[in-house]
Amino acid sequence: MDFLLALVLVSSLYLQAAAEFDGRWPRQIVSSIGLCRYGGRIDCCWGWARQSWGQCQPVCQPRCKHGECIGPNKCKCHPGYAGKTCNQDLNECGLKPRPCKHRCMNTYGSYKCYCLNGYMLMPDGSCSSALTCSMANCQYGCDVVKGQIRCQCPSPGLQLAPDGRTCVDVDECATGRASCPRFRQCVNTFGSYICKCHKGFNLMYIGGKYQCHDIDECSLGQYQCSSFARCYNIHGSYKCKCKEGYQGDGLTCVYIPKVMIEPSGPIHVPKGNGTILKGDRGHNNWIPDVGSTWWPPKTPYIPPIITNRPTSKPTTRPTPKPTPIPTPPPPPPLPTELRTPLPPTTPERPTPRLTSIAPAAGTPPGGITVDNRVQTDPQKLRGDVFIPRQPSNDLFEIFEIERGVSADDEAKDDPGILVHSCNFDHGLCGWIREKDNDLHWEPIRDPAGGQYLTVSAAKAPGGKAARLVLPLGRLMHSGDLCLSFRHKVTGLHSGTLQVFVRKHGAHGAALWGRNGGHGWRQTQITLRGADIKSVIFKGEKRRGHTGEIGLDDVSLKKGHCSEER
């Protein structure tokens, strides 16, 4: 009996544990897609989300641009598109077998077939021999409309030239055919156009669509303000403002010098107009306001010149205390007078008066006058504030004045004129990675700071290559160019790095190459000849090669290189 009770107890515990274990492992229900059983509960599987109508739909992050989401992070692209998120155009003309027997032109999301000269495009897409088209000698084939031969162009962005046989590009940006969203500018291409973000904006995927987002140059450090200025981000750009105590345009800020003169004490000036002269004895040329108080600079005391009036000799003290001098108002018109602080006198003694030499009514006759004319002193500046000079007549011992450097001086310092420069820290700077290559140039973080480009690892067994192209375009120069760059080809069987230039059609033989070595090296190459259309860096790697190919600090200058290395 005890054995049976123990067996029943063990069986119940086992069934309970089995039920709990089954609840921890979700199992998908075969009859429903996206539904899983979590023990006794049924819910959407991982990577699926329940919609408002109750069904479970797969979730793809980021979203499929030209396709539909059929599973967790799995897109099914529409015809003509490829990529993980269906955001890349599929080049159908490069597929094998080719979709067209004669000429094939890839378009965005599709392709078009064209016939060779002497053939006509039929409604089913095939090419049929047509003697009339061979005689027309059209660039992209022809079509017969109502018995008339007409050459055709493969894209709406192309139109027939005046000769009626060739096709020329239509500038959609200039003609107004293009319509770009806000914050994007139109850039014409051959046969089409693209909408590119304005300078100061980056194309980002926000809110389920691509938008041009403002770049905060201040937080990223991509500004050229003075070290004595602050950077303020604005929409699409930034501005620089000098800090307090500095002045300038923000790109260049100069310190504002502060000049202070120690006052000696207040002297009350009585009401009325007066003139205090500046001459060889150090007086200030200053006209006070009515009833104002003036703080003169420290100057030695000069005793006044006494007139011949019968006055007593004043009693002076070594350090006189400035006191207000009461003066009765004289009869008009008043002469220009010079008043100086006098030592205190006894009440019964009259105050000595100093009268100027200016001839005016009311001047007492027989008085000894003082010349109040402004003396010519070319070695001293005039004004309310004076900057004291040193004995050598030099101001630069007091203030630090920054000497400006003109553009001509900089051109003399650097005789090679820069055409292009890129360190790949903030992008490719106009360099283009060819998408048709098996390998690609990828940016990688440099332990010393910044970024450099490296060739991705090969996955296929055959020989693979990655090309990096700089189209010169408007930078094209009629003379020689100096190409300078840093590079490394390290490791066992690392591969090969080569430099090419393209002038007309395909590029020629390699101008330079490296297939081994240790560490970074600096190389300069003179690109000789005119009409260089593009510069190409080619990196080749094979599967299983463990080495690394690196490229950084590429620049182009006009003229010959100072030394080839």
Swiss-Prot record:
Its main location: secreted. One of its GO terms (molecular function) is calcium ion binding. SMART domains: EGF, EGF_CA, MAM. GO terms for biological process: cell adhesion; cell differentiation. InterPro entries: ConA-like_dom_sf (IPR013320), EGF-like_Ca-bd_dom (IPR001881), EGF-like_dom (IPR000742), EGF-type_Asp/Asn_hydroxyl_site (IPR000152), EGF_Ca-bd_CS (IPR018097), EGF_dom (IPR024731), Growth_fac_rcpt_cys_sf (IPR009030), MAM_dom (IPR000998). Residues 301-373 are annotated as: Disordered. One of its GO terms (cellular component) is membrane. Residues 317-349 have a biased composition (Pro residues). Residues 304-316 have a biased composition (Low complexity). A motif (Integrin interaction) lies at residues 382-384. CDD domains: EGF_CA, MAM. Residues 52-87, 89-128, 132-168, 169-213, 214-254 form the EGF-like domain. Residues 420-563 form the MAM domain. Keywords: Calcium, Cell adhesion, Developmental protein, Differentiation, Disulfide bond, EGF-like domain, Extracellular matrix, Repeat, Secreted, Signal. It comes from the Eukaryota. Disulfide bonds join 56-69, 60-75, 77-86, 93-104, 100-113, 115-127, 173-186, 180-195, 197-212, 218-231, 225-240, 242-253. It holds the Pfam family EGF_CA. It is found in: Secreted, Extracellular space, Extracellular matrix. Coiled coil: none annotated. Belongs to the nephronectin family. Functional ligand of integrin alpha-8/beta-1 in kidney development. Regulates the expression of GDNF with integrin alpha-8/beta-1 which is essential for kidney development. May also play a role in the development and function of various tissues, regulating cell adhesion, spreading and survival through the binding of several integrins. The MAM domain is required for localization at the cell surface. Homodimer and homotrimer. This is Nephronectin. It comes from Pongo abelii (Sumatran orangutan). The gene is NPNT.
